[in-house]
Amino acid sequence: MLYIPQFSIYFCLGYLLLFCKISNAVKQSWEINQELITEANKEHTVFGDMLLTPAQLIRYENSKDSDLSIRGVSIKGSSMNRWSNNIVPYVISPQYSPAQKQILVSSLRYFERVSCFKFVERTTQNDYLFIVPLDGCYSYVGKIGGRQTLSLAADCIADYIIWHEMMHAIGFEHEHQRPDRDSFIRVDYANVIPGQMINFDKLKTSHVEYPDIYDFKSIMHYDGYAFGRVDTARRVRLATMTPLKPGVTLEDNMKFTATDIEKLNRLGQCGARGGQYSNQGVVASTCQDVATAVSCEGNRRRGMCKNPFYKQMMIKSCQKTCRLCSYTRMIDEDDDLTPNTTVKSVKCEDKHPRCDIYSHNGFCTLPFYDDVRYQLCAKTCNLC
């Protein structure tokens, strides 16, 4: 029988190489949109993942100010741009599978846990979100009135992307477009993909409120390589944003920070009604890796800490190295409300052609594979 160390991810180099692809690393909305958005929608989609109304588009095209003055909504928008009583009605397109819908609803339920905003299925409300799988991940900023499209294509169905787009829909801009951002990051324009400079424009000071510290880890901050050109010789993407603060890195932000939640609750005037996880950005002192330091560091370098496919594995084995300790605490406190991408499929079937071989090598029984066997070999492992 093939021996597979319980906490080693190096099975990627062995029998399971066929389904372990490092190229499937976690992607942000801007990356997905670069691949999926059609030319027609590119005319209306700006700043990576935001839509403009026709009126906003006209103002943008006629604007000669390098600072953005086109937005009908921002964190400092008027009450007409806000969702009444913090209630956001929504309709989920029937195009989504039951599994995708479960992830969507679960993500909304978690959003409610950290705030006093409520997402309710639409009945007769005139203003509502229509969540539909179009050609990317994008949203308007704040309420625009009537049926409001929020696109989440299949590749966008991940909790952190859903939260990011919902933050836009409620009224939040990107953190890296703050008027004061140049005091905290340097934008390397020479490394930006031609035609994508607009994604680094700053908002007008009069349009936003920013009494909080600059939040490098905000779920509304893009990673440091966003819209970066690819150096074909070295086969790497070039950095477009560099933190000015020593020791800080701009990574894929996949969860709310304490500052995100404070802003969210201040906008909704939540008081004591929401934000019970506002301290989640603090890593618990008991946070430890179970796997060896060498194994966890190797997993981190290969991108597995940020890959949703391996998320539960990393929480169990490398939570300290992967900086997933606060996420573990949230799972422990409220398992049923924590989004989980391992969802039950309607059809009982295997997703991988070699499940019979994997089953003989312990794939169906070893605890290490608890979080992936259902996705790949549900039928062979008798899980449905």
From Swiss-Prot:
It comes from the Eukaryota. Its cofactor is Zn(2+). PANTHER family: DISCOIDIN, CUB, EGF, LAMININ , AND ZINC METALLOPROTEASE DOMAIN CONTAINING, ZINC METALLOPROTEINASE NAS-12. Residues 1-25 form the signal peptide. Glycans are attached at residue 340. Binds 1 zinc ion per subunit. One of its GO terms (cellular component) is extracellular region. Coiled coil: none annotated. InterPro entries: Astacin-like_dom, MetalloPept_cat_dom_sf, Peptidase_M12A, Peptidase_Metallo, ShKT_dom. GO terms for biological process: proteolysis. Expressed in pharyngeal glands. Its EC number is 3.4.24.-. Residues 73-271 form the Peptidase M12A domain. Metalloprotease. Zn(2+) binds at residues 164, 168, 174. Pfam families: Astacin, ShK. Residues 287-325, 348-384 form the ShKT domain. Gene3D superfamilies: 1.10.10.1940, Collagenase (Catalytic Domain). This is Zinc metalloproteinase nas-12.
